[in-house]
């Protein structure tokens, strides 16, 4: 299905596809849940979740009430999760097509990848905007390790900042390393430091999606 020729779509612009990636346990599903809850009264949303052998993230989002159950589709990727978002994204592209049959006027399609390493990136065929999430508990050194998720994502999210004192992480060092790794000849690529337990940084993530994705409510 062409995103520019969706049957029964009444909106002029195609849906915005937002890919959310990051290592296991970084907070991808929590971020997706909070984005859906905060944005669903303003925008028409659907979500695709990726797990290797289960549909656990789909279940978690459904139980939490992030969206109506029929607006969340779980994909079992098998094998390496990055394959399903990069080398062969067909399983996710098919999932998007199926969701758009039922919800042709969707404004945003969120695609959450399975937990993966710092080298994972989304195929441009699958995602218009990419958000890469790490968590402070994984170590202060993570931003300076680099990798496409850290250096090339449209938005880089450093999550669980509240855990810094407990794991000996210096947020100032992480911020400085992030600035160094995400500075390009065209300027600094955006990043946000978040504590999703208290909604800290959530508004900035939403503003990024709305601005860069050129969203129009209604």
Curated annotation (Swiss-Prot):
One of its GO terms (molecular function) is nickel cation binding. SUPFAM superfamilies: P-loop containing nucleoside triphosphate hydrolases. It is found in: Cytoplasm. One of its GO terms (cellular component) is cytoplasm. Facilitates the functional incorporation of the urease nickel metallocenter. This process requires GTP hydrolysis, probably effectuated by UreG. Belongs to the SIMIBI class G3E GTPase family. UreG subfamily. This is Urease accessory protein UreG.
